[in-house]
Regions:
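Short, Lys/Arg-rich flexible segments
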Residues: 2-221
Length: 221
């Protein structure tokens, strides 16, 4: 018997597996005895709808907590709906630090760059590596803080390698502004509990839909 939904965390994110628990299976049993295909369809739709609900819930919660654009959080979410005869769906949330330019429109100021209420003093907005403008600061700047530039990578004239980013040579190391999403890590268990509760609500709705469809079909016979 299924143990219900659960989450598995790793260094760079968390995978939420959404699947029926004993409570959900109990709700399915009566219909499954009479209309097994209808019960399976109801379960599949309920899980997939709950995955969509959970994705929106997480995006809004993290966006509000970290003061970043919901669209930026959504880019870190990957949904894997129920397929075929499967009984579970999955939702991946990557929590590696996100580039500051992605959380909202960056704006140059007299003291540096600001984005969504975050101020990066001494920083500048420009293309250092790649085609996108990012927020950068020289490592030697008095305004540099490792907290504002987590998980930075280094690219030199010879190509990328781990470490700091070099603008034109290794003599001028630059750090890219990023926003840590590590604060989301403790919330995965809470999200799983919410998803389990929502799954039961949606499952009952889908079961009722299948029952009504069956009754209407019989009434026309």
């Amino acid at each position: 018997m299924s143990v219900g939904s659960y989450t598995k965390l790793s260094a760079d994110g968390g995978m939420i597996t959404l699947q029926p628990s004993a409570v959900h299976i109990q709700a399915l049993q009566d219909l499954a005895k009479v209309l097994p295909k209808a019960a399976a369809n109801a379960q599949r739709r309920a899980i997939n709808k709950t995955l969509g609900w959970l994705m929106t819930r997480i995006a809004r919660a993290v966006g509000s907590q970290e003061q970043i654009a919901i669209s930026a959080v959504r880019q870190r979410l990957r949904s894997y709906p129920v397929a075929g005869g499967g009984m579970s769906g999955k939702l991946w949330f990557g929590i590696n630090a996100i580039e500051a330019r992605r959380i909202g429109p960056p704006r140059k100021t007299g003291q540096g760059v600001s984005v969504k209420g975050r101020r990066y003093r001494g920083a500048f907005l420009g293309k250092v590596y790649g085609s996108k403008k990012d927020i950068w600061i020289r490592k030697a700047s008095k305004h540099f803080s490792a907290d504002d530039y987590p998980d930075s990578e280094l690219t030199s004239a010879r190509g990328p390698r781990s470490g700091w980013i070099a603008e034109h040579s290794d003599r001028h190391p630059l750090a890219k502004a990023k926003v840590s999403l590590e604060q989301a890590r403790p919330h995965f268990d809470h999200w799983v509990k919410q998803a389990d509760q929502q799954l039961l609500v949606v499952l009952r709705q889908e079961l009722n839909f299948e029952i009504q469809k069956y009754l209407k079909g019989n009434a026309r016979v």
